[in-house]
Amino acid sequence: MAEFLDDQETRLCDNCKKEIPVFNFTIHEIHCQRNIGMCPICKEPFPKSDMETHMAAEHCQVTCKCNKKLEKRLLKKHEETECPLRLAVCQHCDLELSILKLKEHEDYCGARTELCGNCGRNVLVKDLKTHPEVCGREGEEKRNEVAIPPNAYDESWGQDGIWIASQLLRQIEALDPPMRLPQRPLRAFESDVFHDRTTNQRNITAQVSIQNNLFEEQERQERNRGQQPPKEGGEDGANLDFMLALSLQNEGQASSVAEQDFWRAVCEADQSHGGPSSLSDIKGAADETMLPCEFCEELYPEELLIDHQTSCNPSRALPSLNTGSSSPRGVEEHDVIFQNFLQQAASKQLDSLMGLSSSRLVEESIIIPCEFCGVQLEEEVLFHHQDQCDQRPATATNHVTEGIPRLDSQPQENSPELPRRRVRHQGDLSSGYLDDIKQETANGPTSCLPPSRPFNNMTATYNQLSRSTSGPRPGCQPSPPRVLKLNNSDSQDIQGRNQNSQNGAIAPGHISVIRPPQSLYPENIVPSFPHGPAGRYGASGRSEGGRNSRVTPAAANYRSRTAKAKPSKQQGAGDAEEEEEE
């Protein structure tokens, strides 16, 4: 029967897309078209009665917690494999986090350390799984290693200085310089270096091995150099440029400028060791124009004179490039000069020649020269120094102006305008005096005034003269008159008025005001006015007093004495004045 079923023929149903046996195909096709329908989305056959349920359960749109919309039948798969907000467990602490924050958390969590119970070391949490494989081996490797003493680190620059000096020596010999160096200067240099080493440094195994390797390398290079023909200057120039760039990498200068600065520093260092005489001997070898330095009076070529005077000027106070003690003056050969340079490289002074030590000092305190005297000072002190510098132009002019006489001591000009301006700024008057002047001005008579004289000044002068010239009242003691000052312009004006009165320009009853005294002593004063009636004098004083602003103290003193000597006449003058006023 099974063989019969396998051998029977089938046909494809157009509705449900399934293979149906031929003998049952007609009945199935009728039933399928009546009861079964095809889903338009998933293309699967479903009963027509369950089609709505299928669409609502499988193909409706839902929103995931990551705000993504998809069909409901795909939501489960999305949440398990694709959703970025799905939960995941940290591999270090078993904490559930979203997949977005899991990587950041694992990096932070794995950076923690935990103490290993076997080796006693702190191990990172992320390395705990692989730590048992290497646990205990790192301690054995450290114990087998040879510890490098601290002195070996201190001598690292000494080794670099030896290597740099040796390389520079070879490059200089290859360039055929004008001054000839000794054939084997390195041997003497190496011996000096080893004599300077202490016994503790010689016993260091690592340091000795480094030195041996260095000298073996030097000997090997010398043998290769003797066997090979001389090369062209391209490779040597490249090595020299590399050495200069290495030594001046902090300067930021061009290669040519850096090379000039380097050799200038070498020459100045040699000069500090051997004195200026050795440098002058080297420079004097060439037939050049030699000029004397204005500070040390040594002869130098014309091209190097400015640089030398800059460093030789005592007022510049330039710091020395060499910290060692200077040797006594004497003529040194070229090989001795270069030996000193190599010794500086071995004694940690090559960094000063390269300008490395100065850069460290600059970081600590900036040194700036004074713009007036050139003395180099720290940045904090420079401002106060320049403010009090002796060579500052503003400060120098103050010293010069001290010897110039003041304007007060110079003779005054004869211009009449200057005294008038000065009178207005003289001593202040008391308040009581001003009140009296105002009251008398309101009651007193006025006279014709010239347009050139101010009215207030004339009125005040008139009141003062009328009070001073009037005699004492009967039964009262004569009081001394107030003292007024007379300026130059007013005195000249009064003298002109006196001359006009004598010529008849003024009425005969008017008299002139007192002239300024010729002496400081009141005994020598001779009055210039006639002894006329007091009433006329009072009238004259009223008319002429307006032109006089102040009266000299000597004239006032003379009036007080005259009043005391002749009381009867003054009393009679006072009675006559009262009669005229009535």
Swiss-Prot record:
<dbReference type="GO" id="GO:0008270">
    <property type="term" value="F:zinc ion binding"/>
</dbReference>
<feature type="zinc finger region" description="TRAF-type">
    <location>
        <begin position="27"/>
        <end position="103"/>
    </location>
</feature>
<keyword id="KW-0479">Metal-binding</keyword>
<keyword id="KW-0597">Phosphoprotein</keyword>
<keyword id="KW-0862">Zinc</keyword>
<feature type="region of interest" description="Disordered">
    <location>
        <begin position="402"/>
        <end position="509"/>
    </location>
</feature>
<feature type="compositionally biased region" description="Polar residues">
    <location>
        <begin position="454"/>
        <end position="471"/>
    </location>
</feature>
<feature type="modified residue" description="N-acetylalanine">
    <location>
        <position position="2"/>
    </location>
</feature>
<feature type="region of interest" description="Disordered">
    <location>
        <begin position="522"/>
        <end position="582"/>
    </location>
</feature>
<feature type="modified residue" description="Phosphoserine">
    <location>
        <position position="415"/>
    </location>
</feature>
<feature type="modified residue" description="Phosphoserine">
    <location>
        <position position="320"/>
    </location>
</feature>
<feature type="modified residue" description="Phosphoserine">
    <location>
        <position position="191"/>
    </location>
</feature>
<feature type="modified residue" description="Phosphoserine">
    <location>
        <position position="470"/>
    </location>
</feature>
<dbReference type="InterPro" id="IPR049439">
    <property type="entry name" value="TRAFD1-XIAF1_Znf"/>
</dbReference>
<dbReference type="GO" id="GO:0045824">
    <property type="term" value="P:negative regulation of innate immune response"/>
</dbReference>
<dbReference type="GO" id="GO:0005739">
    <property type="term" value="C:mitochondrion"/>
</dbReference>
<feature type="modified residue" description="Phosphoserine">
    <location>
        <position position="326"/>
    </location>
</feature>
<feature type="modified residue" description="Phosphoserine">
    <location>
        <position position="327"/>
    </location>
</feature>
<feature type="modified residue" description="Phosphoserine">
    <location>
        <position position="278"/>
    </location>
</feature>
<feature type="compositionally biased region" description="Polar residues">
    <location>
        <begin position="486"/>
        <end position="504"/>
    </location>
</feature>
<feature type="modified residue" description="Phosphoserine">
    <location>
        <position position="409"/>
    </location>
</feature>
<feature type="modified residue" description="Phosphoserine">
    <location>
        <position position="430"/>
    </location>
</feature>
<comment type="subunit">
    <text>Interacts with MAVS, TICAM1, TRAF1, TRAF2, TRAF3 and TRAF6.</text>
</comment>
<dbReference type="InterPro" id="IPR051986">
    <property type="entry name" value="Innate_Immune_Apopt_Reg"/>
</dbReference>
<keyword id="KW-0007">Acetylation</keyword>
<dbReference type="InterPro" id="IPR013083">
    <property type="entry name" value="Znf_RING/FYVE/PHD"/>
</dbReference>
<keyword id="KW-0863">Zinc-finger</keyword>
<dbReference type="Pfam" id="PF21366">
    <property type="entry name" value="TRAFD1-XIAF1_ZnF"/>
</dbReference>
<feature type="region of interest" description="Disordered">
    <location>
        <begin position="216"/>
        <end position="238"/>
    </location>
</feature>
<comment type="function">
    <text>Negative feedback regulator that controls excessive innate immune responses. Regulates both Toll-like receptor 4 (TLR4) and DDX58/RIG1-like helicases (RLH) pathways. May inhibit the LTR pathway by direct interaction with TRAF6 and attenuation of NF-kappa-B activation. May negatively regulate the RLH pathway downstream from MAVS and upstream of NF-kappa-B and IRF3.</text>
</comment>
<protein>
    <recommendedName>
        <fullName>TRAF-type zinc finger domain-containing protein 1</fullName>
    </recommendedName>
</protein>
